[in-house]
């Protein structure tokens, strides 16, 4: 098997090698260049270790910096970012890039401050499980014609968006001192015809021109949607529209959320794919599985054990390295929240994604394991120019082990990526590995792989000007060139390690500090240093000056290499080494003091190797800690945690309740509502009745809609109503104030119909009112039939049964429609419930004395609606990060639509009859961790059985003493209630 694969790969390498030019710069800038090996920034090769981050899903700019610091600390040097058109444009011609979390300049500034690059992805179409795939909702009603083509109507709508956002991206390119290094065109757009006049080709050329007009000069990129086609590569049928850097999206896990035994099947054909599709370009995975989304009725993310497993990161991400990938973006690295009505119907409120960084911004073990790879790629410069020697099962003494073999042609460095051939295997296997080194062919003995484990074995690996490994069976975590060369290796507890220094023929003396016993054995190619990994940290000081840290995996998870530079490209002499705490955000060295900013849940050991004997004092979050110097030069002490903090979220006892569906009453004054009087729609989806009742045709897009249809006569026996508001969405109807039916919603139905029966006793001779209230779970993405993002929302058709016609229809949605009356929270935060329109969810609103003293636990007895409000105060310590959430519960069988508002932000859409989510976290800035908070809950029943909750409780997640500034005034993000809301009754 090895011979066949090696011959094939050598043939591909020969063909590619004769077609390659190096250091391509596309004529626009030399700050970012590329060749078939890697991207280069400012003349230095870069392993792009990136994570996907969507600022829309975290509407607190200060928390972006929190996330970026955590990513930087855990080995990432870049983020990939979607810019959603719909988040910034409430109406045609209007763009908001300044208000609150719409201020994307702050995104770029924080990225630069944290020391991470940005890959910009502005669409115009994004997908991303966000409503309408990121399109502006005002445009997603059919007026764009044939979307994602060269259609003139479509071009006229998206061009202003790309120009406006493109100018801001351009101003933040690396050429202008900013962090942007790549700019993506469109998203997963499959090239279906290699013809220059094809509409997709013309469309991609249009995008390129508009981005260029906006001033973009960094290389362009695109992301192929899996191995289904080859699209927009200059190396494959380039007839126009091709980008500079071709990329392939891959979500290969095939995992079951609740069955860890299923799936876990590696893809081992990436290298061949890229050699065929983009042989002059570096291998780029713009979206590689960092988790997976869950649908309505699916699973809670915290129960997805397989996706959350650090084993996934270990095996899959190292397999990518073995495939010679040098640009990798983890989708998602932090998912965040589909707050407001930002979700597409395929997902619920949480967008946790089982990502390495939890929705609550807490670090999962998966991120800790990912860090081991990120820190390794950061210092392993020889990895950035390798040839594929071969792959297969012939490199080891056990045919159950699969090997990727990479070699750097300039330095002879080798990287052997090992995993079980059957990647889902749970077997523990011990074997020897045959490698090629500068000292000749060598068999490295006693390598052990646990089940679902991967290792990168290095040979001829330089870790200092005069320090190198001939080989090591332990994995390299990182190294530092300080006063001495410091090498950091890791293994699982109980695994055997063996390493040999290059060009060190004589046996070195050494001293060991820790629980791991190291012995030396002279061989024909140098002295072997042999050990079995014990728990904890062991330091070994060699007589050649090298200091080696030997870590077990759990200790490696808490090992950091914080940079002393803000440059995303960190040289081995531009970081120090810290072991022990939960998080190290940053370090500075001032004279004799090393100042560390970090977080800790519990008090931990703290070991700092700064490489400078003048450094005698360690400060943790501004306070000096007691420390001592070890015999090998580090400083050790204790970093305080939060175990002493008493966290008791207040109970929610004092509620006010008001009717949030007064508009179901026949005498309700709807004279200021929007009249539905259109007889034709720009939407291509056929009408089921007249007038047009598509909510988007009247400027109401997100959230609940309320319709009131009038008719005369007592002979009507019912109505046939069809509604489309996304899967899982329900609706209910009232005739002259009395409930007459509806649909509770289902996870497999976006369009629902019901025949409503009218009791003749409810009818009047004139002016009967049928009120229909519809829930909303988002606009569809492009792939959903029949028309994707244009699939209309609201009532598709309504006809009377038994004779007669509706004489009029009126609609009410979010207050102001497209006017965007709350620009801070934006156009997709609210819907059309009366309480929302009146602003009862906003801070500063005071319920009148007439409001009932009732809570969601009391609920409602029939098909009604209530809006509940209360306030509470949090007094967390100023240096504490304590994510807070709201736990809801409802009696079995409850069918209702529940929304949660925290300080005006809709941060929970709870459907107890569908699920799965019942716990809703709030980030600092949405919730005031040191101040008063306004909590509102809207609830309306989908049946005449009524609805109530049986649990409404604030809960704390973890608690962390932090050096981040959580003691902030979030008032600018929480505009107060104003009495002008009354005009939207």
From Swiss-Prot:
This protein's record includes keyword Hydrolase: yes
Cystine residue pairs: 257-304
Gene3D superfamilies noted in UniProt: Beta-galactosidase, domain 2, Beta-galactosidase, domain 3, Galactose-binding domain-like, Glycosidases
Catalytic activity as recorded in UniProt: Hydrolysis of terminal non-reducing beta-D-galactose residues in beta-D-galactosides
Key word Iron-sulfur present: no
Known EC number: 3.2.1.23
Annotated compartments: Secreted
Annotated active site: 188, 287
Binding site for substrate: 82, 127-129, 187, 251, 353
Entry-linked InterPro entries: Betagal_dom2, Betagal_dom2_sf, BetaGal_dom3, BetaGal_dom3_sf, BetaGal_jelly_roll_dom, Galactose-bd-like_sf, Gly_Hdrlase_35_cat, Glycoside_Hdrlase_35
Subcellular location, principal: secreted
Parts of the chain that traverse the membrane: none
Superkingdom of this protein's organism: Eukaryota
A Gene Ontology BP annotation from the UniProt entry: polysaccharide catabolic process
Gene Ontology molecular function, alphabetical: beta-galactosidase activity
Leader sequence segment: 1-23
Record keywords, A-Z: Carbohydrate metabolism, Disulfide bond, Glycoprotein, Glycosidase, Hydrolase, Polysaccharide degradation, Secreted, Signal
Pfam families for the chain: BetaGal_ABD2, BetaGal_dom2, BetaGal_dom3, Glyco_hydro_35
Glycosylation sites (chain numbering): 276, 391, 434, 517, 602, 677, 715, 720, 759
Entries under SMART domains matching the protein: BetaGal_dom2
One GO CC annotation: extracellular region
Family: Belongs to the glycosyl hydrolase 35 family.
Stated role: Cleaves beta-linked terminal galactosyl residues from gangliosides, glycoproteins, and glycosaminoglycans.
Name of the protein described by the UniProt record: Probable beta-galactosidase C
Species of the source: Aspergillus clavatus (strain ATCC 1007 / CBS 513.65 / DSM 816 / NCTC 3887 / NRRL 1 / QM 1276 / 107)
